[in-house]
Design a protein with these regions (language model features):
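Accessory RNA 3′-end/elbow-binding domains used by RNA modification enzymes
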Residues: 1-10, 16-37, 41-44, 95, ...
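The conserved catalytic core of RNA pseudouridine synthases
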Residues: 24-28, 46, 136-184
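Glycine/acidic-rich beta-strand-loop module
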Residues: 30-60, 127
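Residue-level signal for inorganic ion chemistry
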Residues: 47, 67, 122, 175, ...
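Structural signature of FAD isoalloxazine-binding scaffolds in flavoprotein oxidoreductases
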Residues: 56-71, 135-149
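Acidic, low-complexity central loop/insert segments
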Residues: 58-112
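Extended alpha-helical targeting/anchoring segments
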Residues: 116, 120-140, 144
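Pseudouridine synthase
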Residues: 117, 121, 129, 158-203
């Protein structure tokens, strides 16, 4: 079994639990995922099966989410699963939210949440946070927010639904918290759904149930060329033999990383200097 899988992770379980379930269904150990989703979050979890795991790092890294947040509250985890407190601040107006979102577009600096898996001095931040040792100098990261569109705002209940398209490494919880701080009312994340990741959409995602079979997984597999945005180089018999041995061979192609195809099947990832191709990861 070889390829990618677009899994709709339900809320309430970890991304690793999805992998464990797939291993049980398929009997295959070589399964991995890209872009961890917190237990609270649901939606698209890109999964690689078999030697497709060698290609996980080459999946497109941009993502899109729909997040539901509530103003008038604060939390140490920036979501409803943490220690939540009411701020008793006046109700936030839509115009304030719109102004705050302007500052969260394009390339921005973002500080990861204290409860996150980011490393800090050899430890995960969440480990320090659980020990009550939250650093006050967590380094910021540059991220890109391509879109933050208001889908709905319930003024009475102070609940905002927002669509966010962003780069790798973006913490939606931080976006929520920062917007809460901008309005001075505080805000916590209530729900999070990833609607797109690695060229996979939530409309096409499969849900894993107790009835899901190995054949169901097999029929849902996605070919690497459909989700990885790299040029494809077609090979002849001679090139194929070179690839099997990991040998460099002469062939004009685009410069950079390329996917190698033989008989309409992706067999390797390679690097090209324009004239010669060197296999990097053989997938057979």
């Amino acid at each position: 079994m070889f390829g990618f899988l677009n899994v709709n992770k339900p809320s309430g379980i970890t991304s690793h639990q999805v992998i464990s379930k797939l291993r049980k269904i398929t009997g295959i150990k070589q399964i991995g995922h890209a872009g961890t989703l917190d237990p609270l979050a649901c939606g698209v979890l890109p999964v690689a099966i078999g030697k497709a795991t060698k290609l996980l790092d080459y999946l497109p890294s941009d993502k899109a989410y729909i997040v539901k947040m509530q103003f008038g509250k604060r939390s140490d985890t920036y979501d409803i699963e943490g220690n939540v407190e009411e701020t008793n601040y006046r109700k936030v107006m839509l115009v304030e939210i719109e102004k705050g979102l302007v500052f969260q577009r394009g390339k921005v600096k973002q500080i990861p949440p204290a409860f996150s898996a980011v490393h800090y001095n050899g430890k995960r931040l969440y480990e320090l946070a659980r020990e009550g040792k939250i650093p006050d100098d967590i380094p910021s990261r540059e991220i890109t927010i391509y879109e933050n569109e208001i889908l709905n705002f319930d003024f009475d209940n102070q609940i905002l639904e927002l669509k966010v398209a962003c780069s790798k490494g973006t913490y939606i919880r931080t976006i929520v918290n920062d917007l809460g701080e901008y309005t001075k009312a505080g805000a916590v994340m209530c729900e999070l759904t990833r609607i797109n990741s690695a060229n996979m959409n939530i409309e096409d995602a499969i849900s894993l149930t107790d009835e899901t079979t190995k054949d169901d997984i097999l029929s849902a597999l996605i070919e690497p060329k459909k989700v990885i945005d790299l040029p494809i180089v077609k090979l002849n018999d001679e090139h194929y033999k070179k690839v099997l041995n990991g040998n460099k061979f002469k062939l004009n192609s685009e410069i950079g990383d390329v996917l190698l195809s033989f008989e309409d099947k992706i067999i390797a990832l390679a690097n090209s200097d324009g004239n010669y191709i060197q296999p990097k990861k053989v997938l057979l």
